[in-house]
């Protein structure tokens, strides 16, 4: 059985050994997985918000913000031996967890997190190969870096494989 590494809210982890990266309770948050299938190295981020509301200095950049999570993981993945042209992405979460009256004119947090993730991936030239986003339910993810497979678990929903 593979070692399990938990990725908390606003965190990202990169693993160069075969492990299972897990994150729990993705509601409007987004889980972004990056993977290099040739070297079997991957990373997982659990992002909270699309972007900061004020300018933040470089040292303060964290995976709390979806707009930065991809860049932070790519930087670490390249140090571990990944090639940028081999990276692929999978995305899950971004649910609508609150009633419509609590959403802004730009959509709910979940929708904006998904949009920010897609923009960051496009900016980095990383193809999005699978996703399970939206809906009105939370998700938990298990990302096996030996296979690149993500198991998506949600209450009263069938288990999905990305």
From Swiss-Prot:
Record carries keyword Hydrolase: yes
Q: Spell out the reaction equation it catalyses.
A: L-glutaminyl-[protein] + H2O = L-glutamyl-[protein] + NH4(+)
The protein's matches in HAMAP family, at most eight in alphabetical order, are given as: CheD (MF_01440)
List the molecular function annotations (GO) for this entry: protein-glutamine glutaminase activity
Keywords for this entry?
A: Chemotaxis, Hydrolase
Which protein, by its recorded name, is this? Probable chemoreceptor glutamine deamidase CheD 2
Q: Which residues form a coiled coil?
A: none
**Mind telling me which InterPro entries this protein's record contains?**
CheD-like_sf, Chemorcpt_Glu_NH3ase_CheD, Cytotoxic_necrot_fac-like_cat
Q: What Enzyme Commission number(s) does the record list for this chain?
A: 3.5.1.44
Sequence similarity? Belongs to the CheD family.
A Gene Ontology biological process noted in the UniProt record is: chemotaxis
Q: What task does this protein carry out?
A: Probably deamidates glutamine residues to glutamate on methyl-accepting chemotaxis receptors (MCPs), playing an important role in chemotaxis.
Q: Any S-S bridges, and between which cysteines? A: none
Q: Would the keyword Hydrolase be found if you checked this record's keyword annotation?
A: yes
